[in-house]
């Protein structure tokens, strides 16, 4: 899949200490990501990961990052993220420790994920006041079915000069043609399986407003010879609040090289027909009152 990624002119790979309990970082090391010219960003979550428990306290940040670096087989990464807020640790303590790690050369860019806009502002003001490394990137969920970040978060990020990386641009898979109201069978490990530990996606999207929104999008996509996936990726590329000149980017997850090839190709295609753009707007008006908060 790295070959496919680089063939399309991309070099960034996103991972986290919690993904596969560290195994994804180890797998990247086996793939010799550094020799390929890949830029890796990893995240530290304030929770128990396997036998170890992490926080965003000063005494936990360096060991947590060190575990990631060891797994990746590297002395540094391109981006280090705080993976969801640690509300048990004062931000000043965390940010001072992050700044020390930055000055020591462990990473080039600093990122945060899943923080509320007011928290982003507080973080940036603390960093500015103390001369600490300010966040370069905010990573959050954003798709045609989850746009509540547009109202307050995007203006905040623009004010502080922070780029936005969108994960889950297909709303966990709902913006495909795989699922409908009648779906009752799921592949093993499926994120919409109510018996799966990852079934929290079901709580986010498996509801009547979501299916009503899909009823609006899918016929128009079919009319123009597109899958829902293709339409959703073209929407986020051309009709969302994301701006390439601000350093914004889409984080694409794929289970195969073929799927990655398809998703990257769809992101490269042009704007949507106007009636399909309007269908996405109408779909958002249906689901927005039912949308979960963008922050943790």
UniProtKB/Swiss-Prot annotation:
Induction: Does not seem to be up-regulated during banana leaves infection.
Site (Lowers pKa of active site Tyr) location in chain: 47
Single GO molecular function: oxidoreductase activity
Active site: 19 (proton donor)
Keyword vocabulary terms for this entry: NADP, Oxidoreductase
Enzyme class: oxidoreductase
CDD domains documented for this protein: AKR_AKR7A1-5
SUPFAM superfamilies found in the cross-reference section: NAD(P)-linked oxidoreductase
Residue positions binding NADP(+): 14, 113-114, 139, 168-178, 191, 255-263
Residues reported in the UniProt entry to bind substrate: 83, 201
Family from the record: Belongs to the aldo/keto reductase family. Aldo/keto reductase 2 subfamily.
Protein name: Aldo-keto reductase MYCFIDRAFT_156381
């Amino acid at each position: 899949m790295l070959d496919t990624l680089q063939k399309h002119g991309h070099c960034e790979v996103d991972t986290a200490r919690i993904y596969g309990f560290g195994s994804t970082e180890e797998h990247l090391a086996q793939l010799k990501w550094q020799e390929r010219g890949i830029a890796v960003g990893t995240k530290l979550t304030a929770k128990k990961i396997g036998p170890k428990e992490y926080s965003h306290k000063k005494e936990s940040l360096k060991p947590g990052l060190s575990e990631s670096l060891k797994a990746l087989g590297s002395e540094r990464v391109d981006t280090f993220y705080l993976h969801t807020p640690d509300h048990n640790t004062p931000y000043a303590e965390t940010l001072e420790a992050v700044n020390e790690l930055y000055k020591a050369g462990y990473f080039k860019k600093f990122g945060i994920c899943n923080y509320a806009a007011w928290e982003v502002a507080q973080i940036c003001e603390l960093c500015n006041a103390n001369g600490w490394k300010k966040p370069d990137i905010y990573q959050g969920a954003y798709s045609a079915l989850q746009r509540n970040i547009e109202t307050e978060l995007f203006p905040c990020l623009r004010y502080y000069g922070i780029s936005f990386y969108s994960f889950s641009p297909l709303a966990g898979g709902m913006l495909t043609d795989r699922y409908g109201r009648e779906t009752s069978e799921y592949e093993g490990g499926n994120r919409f399986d109510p018996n799966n530990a990852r079934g929290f996606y079901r709580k986010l999207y498996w509801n009547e407003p979501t299916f009503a929104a899909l009823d609006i999008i899918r016929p128009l996509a079919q009319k123009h010879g597109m899958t829902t996936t293709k339409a959703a990726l073209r929407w986020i590329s051309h009709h969302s609040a994301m701006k390439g000149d601000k350093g914004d980017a889409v984080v694409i997850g794929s289970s195969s090289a073929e799927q990655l090839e398809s998703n990257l190709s769809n992101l490269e295609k042009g704007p949507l027909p106007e009636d399909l753009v309007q269908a996405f707007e109408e779909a958002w008006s249906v689901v927005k009152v039912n949308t979960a908060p963008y922050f943790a």
